UniProtKB/Swiss-Prot annotation:
Gene Ontology BP annotations: starch biosynthetic process
Transit peptide: 1-76
InterPro entries tied to this protein: Glyco_trans_1, GS/SS, Starch_synth_cat_dom
PANTHER family per UniProt: GRANULE-BOUND STARCH SYNTHASE 1, CHLOROPLASTIC/AMYLOPLASTIC, GRANULE-BOUND STARCH SYNTHASE 1, CHLOROPLASTIC_AMYLOPLASTIC
Cellular component terms (Gene Ontology): amyloplast; chloroplast
Protein name in UniProt: Granule-bound starch synthase 1, chloroplastic/amyloplastic
Pathway: Glycan biosynthesis; starch biosynthesis
Residues annotated to bind ADP-alpha-D-glucose: K97
Length: 606
């Protein structure tokens, strides 16, 4: 691709009144508010923000004086000088989501904006989002040997600029419900032009300098920004900054943080495709990768995630224990473990949307409650759940729930294999999820085999998911691996203890005997169901249902609900990591509260 010149980018950082200041380089290592997590064995976990052999923090002598900023009066935010932060990702809830990536880009940015930072999120426009307007800004992006016209759409929600990249390759493929059509026509099937699609995203994101002032957009973010890239879809972005912009004096002081949400998806493509990225030869070694697996291309490939890790200024992931797993070896680092041991990686546990998931206000549950009224209310919600699921209504029967995407990572096959042993107990099981057809059939077969004790719902059903959280006694999370996990946070928010595998963020967030039960680590081999794993799941769930209804169980319910599971703590940890990059003008935020996240003006309308 031809390099950009300053004249091609109409705006610059001058509108911010930038002077120099010294950026702090310390990393706040503070955990989540509430119960202190510990390992399944009972020892204290270090914290929920931990760094493993991280790069040295850059020391830059810079300072900033930022002019005043104005936000709509419907939401009140803290007014610190803050940072200019631009998140880039393939998903952004609620407009688009297949899993945790969408949740993070939906929830973390508003939490950072509440602390006074100016925050933008850039993601593809997969649908005709009715709350996003056409900015009329058009850019031509070179992909392979042709140019593509790309437009910007924008909306301002919860203090965050939401920018959507508009191109037919996004909009024409995903129509109506986005779901799993974002990456392919069906689960596990990728679009053949995904490399071109997400190259557009990576090249278009830095063009935010071209966005114009208007009543809904308060002007350029300038060049002194922190880009936060997320997963393989954004892996080439730091290379494009170095190749196309910085040699021409643009984004010279910008920094890039790269966040890994799931190491299993790396963006591996044929090595011969590298020229289509229009990057110079100097970046080829960062993409170059010898693949030990056989899909999608055998042997030598380009690896987008590898390039993102190597070319960024800081590498993060979504929980401290997952960070440790990623550098532990090939099995859990998926052949990039050696790279991450070189660069270092920081784990910060995710938060959750406590406005959407709030048992005291949830419109989908029969009886609303808080920590003081949870015991009786959950029993009433259990009866409503049993009736809704077509199971015998009896509040004294322990009820286990499984909610998740039906794919190997989440362990639906392991869960199904454990059900026959669980049927020896007086227990009911509700299974909810969609995904691979073979797993949908497997769960339905459990219902057919054990009518009156097992109910499987293999379709998207948000109201039922909320009722399950409120009515279940135990939430089963038998994940083979789990970078952070959201389901256990939602369960604990509703006072439902989790019986979970001891992996990733489940270790950081679920405390054995306090807020849940640990099964131990399960095998990451997705091709087989290990008998030992089935036994771990069955044994742990039987251990859990034995205490349902006891004073010890009631105490666990209260422990779960008395935690702060919001994005507030994680946002502060993210702030301190990004401040450590030393971007000119970056200052700590001032702790603030988002006053009206559910106000009409702030509710997304995808």
């Amino acid at each position: 691709m031809s390099a950009l010149t300053t004249s091609q980018l109409a705006t610059s950082a001058t509108g911010f009144g930038i002077a120099d200041r010294s950026a702090p380089s310390s990393l706040l290592r503070h955990g989540f508010q509430g119960l202190k997590p510990r390992s399944p064995a009972g020892g204290d976990a270090s914290s929920l923000s931990v760094t493993t052999s991280a790069r040295a923090t850059p020391k830059q002598q810079r300072s900033v004086q930022r002019g005043s900023r104005r936000f709509p009066s419907v939401v009140v935010y803290a007014t610190g000088a803050g940072m200019n932060v631009v998140f880039v990702g393939a998903e952004m809830a609620p407009w688009s989501k297949t899993g945790g990536l969408g949740d993070v880009l939906g929830g973390l940015p508003p939490a950072m904006a509440a602390n006074g930072h100016r925050v933008m999120v850039i993601s593809p426009r997969y649908d005709q989002y009715k709350d996003a307007w056409d900015t009329s800004v058009v850019a031509e992006i070179k992909v392979a040997d042709r140019y593509e016209r790309v437009r910007f759409f924008h909306c301002y929600k919860r203090g965050v600029d939401r920018v959507f990249i508009d191109h037919p390759s996004f909009l024409e493929k995903v129509w109506g419900k986005t779901g799993e059509k974002i990456y392919g026509p069906d689960t596990g099937v990728d679009y053949k032009d995904n490399q071109m699609r997400f190259s557009l995203l990576c090249q278009e994101a830095p063009r935010i300098l071209n966005l114009n002032n208007n009543p809904y957009f308060k002007g350029t973010y300038g060049e002194d920004v922190v880009f936060v890239c997320n997963d393989w879809h954004t892996g080439p972005l730091p290379s494009y900054l170095k190749n196309n912009y910085q040699p021409n004096g643009i984004y010279r002081n910008a920094k890039v943080a790269f966040c890994i949400h799931n190491i299993s998806y790396q963006g591996r493509f044929a090595f011969e495709d590298y020229p289509e990225l229009n990057l110079s030869e100097r970046f080829k070694s960062s993409f170059d990768f010898i693949d030990g697996y056989d899909t999608p291309v055998e042997g030598r490939k380009i690896n987008w995630m590898k390039a993102g890790i190597l070319e960024s200024d800081r590498v993060l992931t979504v929980s401290p224990y997952y960070a440790e797993e990623l550098i532990s070896g090939i099995a859990r680092g998926c052949e990039l473990d050696n790279i991450m041991r070189l660069t270092g990686i920081t784990g910060i546990v995710n938060g959750m949307d406590v406005s959407e998931w709030d048992p005291s206000k949830d419109k989908y549950i029969t009886t609303k409650y808080d920590a003081t009224t949870a015991i009786e209310a959950k029993a009433l919600n259990k009866e409503a759940l049993q009736a809704e699921a077509g199971l015998p209504v009896d509040r004294k029967v322990p009820l286990i729930a499984f909610i998740g995407r039906l794919e190997e990572q989440k362990g639906p096959d392991v869960m199904a294999a454990a059900i026959p042993e669980l049927m020896q107990e007086n227990v009911q099981i509700v299974l909810l999820g969609t995904g691979k057809k073979k797993f949908e059939k497997l769960l339905k077969s459990m219902e057919e085999k054990y009518p009156g004790k097992v109910r499987a719902v293999v379709k998207f059903n948000a109201p039922l998911a909320h009722l399950i959280m409120a009515g279940a006694d135990v939430l089963a999370v038998p994940s083979r691996f789990e970078p952070c996990g959201l389901i256990q946070l939602q369960g604990m928010r509703y006072g439902t203890p989790c019986a979970c595998a001891s992996t990733g963020g489940l270790v950081d967030t679920v405390i054995e005997g306090k807020t849940g039960f640990h099964m131990g680590r399960l095998s990451v081999d997705c091709k087989v169901v290990e008998p030992s794993d089935v036994q771990k799941v069955a044994t742990t769930l039987k251990r859990a249902i034995k205490i349902v209804g006891t004073p010890a169980y009631n105490e666990m319910v209260r422990n779960c609900m008395n935690q702060d599971l919001s994005w507030k703590g994680p946002a502060k940890n993210w702030e301190n990591v990004l401040l450590g990059l030393g971007v000119a003008g970056s200052e700590p935020g001032v702790e603030g509260e988002e006053i009206a996240p559910l106000a009409k003006e702030n509710v997304a309308a995808p």
